[in-house]
């Protein structure tokens, strides 16, 4: 799936050139390009869809970089962007949950006084910090020009796994309100669930 593909004037397309993965700039009005909207359960604001290229020709200067271009590093940086998205959405969920569980009352007291609720919120904070630190470590190595593929993979797996869990728990903590449109938790759940599916998914 490609975000904002129907609105793009220029695409960055991965293809093989001389048996090596490379990136090419392709104009959106090139002959042979077609776009089909494919709305998903999450990330609806990005207007996702599928892009089809049928015998599309590009000029020789459309290729990004030279023979030293590090395709794997490019992919890894993209993974870190997805990690940052997950962390931001999880932080939004936590910021919403804390006042909710402190103000929402059941059986004469805030639901945050229940240990099961308090532990769940605390675990979200702990898991978020681990997601953030793993992503920062991989990003720092990348900025220093050091190998960062391993750290990126670890951050991606952690963020994809914990993002699903945090999204689910955010809905659960809101109870019956969690799956209504009156509260944003259901949207965060859908967006965070996508992260385990995109970019080859959680288990590949």
Language-model region placement:
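Amphipathic alpha-helical coiled-coil segments
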Residues: 162-170
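Glycine-rich phosphate/cofactor-binding loops in nucleotide/flavin-utilizing enzymes
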Residues: 174-204
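A short core secondary-structure module
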Residues: 1-33
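Residue-level recognition of alpha-helical structural elements
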Residues: 110-113, 117, 148-151, 181
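Glycine-rich phosphate/pyrophosphate-binding beta-alpha loops
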Residues: 1-5, 77-82, 193-201
């Amino acid at each position: 799936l490609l975000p904002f593909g129907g609105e793009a004037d220029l695409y960055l397309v991965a293809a093989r050139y001389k048996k090596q993965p490379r990136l090419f700039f392709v104009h959106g009005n090139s002959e042979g390009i077609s776009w089909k909207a494919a709305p998903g359960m999450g990330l609806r604001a990005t207007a996702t869809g599928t892009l089809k290229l049928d015998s599309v020709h590009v000029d020789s200067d459309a290729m990004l970089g030279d023979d030293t271009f590090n395709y794997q590093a490019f992919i890894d940086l993209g993974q870190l962007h997805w990690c940052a998205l997950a962390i931001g959405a999880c932080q939004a969920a936590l910021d919403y949950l804390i006042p909710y569980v402190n103000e929402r009352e059941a059986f004469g007291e805030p639901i945050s006084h229940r240990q099961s609720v308090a532990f769940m919120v605390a675990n979200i904070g702990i898991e978020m910090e681990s997601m953030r630190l793993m992503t920062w470590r991989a990003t720092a190595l990348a900025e220093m020009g050091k190998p960062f593929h391993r750290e990126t993979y670890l951050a991606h797996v952690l963020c994809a796994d914990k993002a699903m869990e945090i999204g689910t728990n955010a809905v659960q903590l809101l109870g019956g309100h969690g799956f209504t449109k009156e509260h944003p938790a259901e949207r965060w759940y859908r967006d965070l669930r996508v992260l385990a599916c995109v970019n080859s998914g959680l288990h590949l």
